[in-house]
UniProtKB/Swiss-Prot annotation:
It comes from Thermobifida fusca (strain YX). This is Adenylate kinase. The keyword Kinase applies. Residues 126-136 are annotated as: LID. It holds the Pfam family ADK.
Amino acid sequence: MRVVLVGPPGAGKGTQAQILASKLSIPKVSTGDIFRANVSGGTELGKKAQAYMDRGDLVPDEITNAMVRDRLAEDDARAGFLLDGFPRNLAQAETLDEMLADLGVKLDVVLELVVDEEEVIRRLAERARIDNRSDDNEETIRHRLVVYREQTAPLVSFYEKRGLLEKIDAVGPIEEVTQRAMTALKSRA
């Protein structure tokens, strides 16, 4: 099964990605993991990405896209994968379509973890308190939500129009959210 997981910061994407990938016996593919693997492996793409990160700049889409393309072509991703953190915008979604077409496969489903804004703020504020992260104040969190809405709303609409979107209520105990996601995935299998 080929799955994309989207949702606002604090929706539980990392947690659900780990659990769902394990339950489905497919690799969790996250851009963070891919960046770390390429940088620590000293790949050509890793060196290019590192130069941007060292300057505090965002890694351009073409480098991110190339890293994702390479990762999805690996043997363990042939039977399926769960993408976490990619695509983040419409351009990346269109590139993902091209990548998958080149590999001769299609996306099965896009899971959107749905959490209202106040719950996101509560979760991230709590996470900041526990992790002692002073940068995650309410103003910063609200800004991250604005950026998410601007970039990801068109992405959600793009997948909804294609009949790939499953909205998952991501409020409640982790196990319940996982169960809702698994039910949605089984309906697509």
